[in-house]
């Protein structure tokens, strides 16, 4: 399991955790020097586990789908909670021996924001926010769980996908911050960027369809080819366009 302990967390240990998370995901080669995730995998390798420990030493284990870096479920050790619409094999393979429950929402942002009654841009990130999220999930407070899961997903999966998000969180070891429109636009466009970067391989580096992002100054930017910084320095994992 990949592990991250908040009680001794530093900017450096968080970056190491994200590096270890990226490395734990099986790859299908690289495109423009960016690792591509698998499009299919045998059940026994479908999920990886990450252990997260809060300031008080309470821990949860989250299960991540290696095909898309989605969190599908988490466990407190005795009880496990699965999102709706997870891969059918997830409950058979994960957290056996726990009391398995299904959360009242799927893991997508729209559903979680509706359940949280808040948009992501109004939910604070940073390692203190992750500590609170782990506490909420450990004790399972139904009302607060959706917000906590939004923090968890962005601090793990999204940081693994994008170096920019990783660095924003690494720079907030002792503080909380609300995600910028830059972060939100990256999260919303990971699939689109992944697809266009893979298409560009056969189009001399050109995207078939531009991807619109928001830069740190708040401007809309059209990404049209693989020379963009988002491709050369930011995105760290690509969703395989062969994955269904």
Swiss-Prot record:
InterPro entries, per database record: Ribosome-inact_prot_sf, Ribosome_inactivat_1/2, Ribosome_inactivat_prot, Ribosome_inactivat_prot_CS, Ribosome_inactivat_prot_sub1, Ribosome_inactivat_prot_sub2
Keyword Glycoprotein assigned: yes
PTM field: The N-linked glycan consists of GlcNAc2Man3Xyl.
Residues of this chain annotated as glycosylated in UniProt: 189, 225
GO biological process: defense response; negative regulation of translation
UniProt keyword Metal-binding present: no
One Pfam family in the UniProt entry: RIP
Top-level division of the source organism's lineage: Eukaryota
Keywords from the UniProt entry: Glycoprotein, Hydrolase, Plant defense, Protein synthesis inhibitor, Toxin
Catalyzed chemical reaction(s): Endohydrolysis of the N-glycosidic bond at one specific adenosine on the 28S rRNA
Record-level Gene Ontology MF annotations: rRNA N-glycosylase activity; toxin activity
Similarity comment: family membership: Belongs to the ribosome-inactivating protein family. Type 1 RIP subfamily.
Main function: Has cytotoxic activity towards cancer cells, but not normal cells. Inhibits the growth of the human leukemia cell line K562, the murine melanoma cell line B16 and the lung adenocarcinoma cell line A549 with IC(50) values of 88.1 nM, 63.4 nM and 359.3 nM respectively.
Name of the featured protein: Ribosome-inactivating protein cucurmosin
Protein's organism: Cucurbita moschata (Winter crookneck squash)
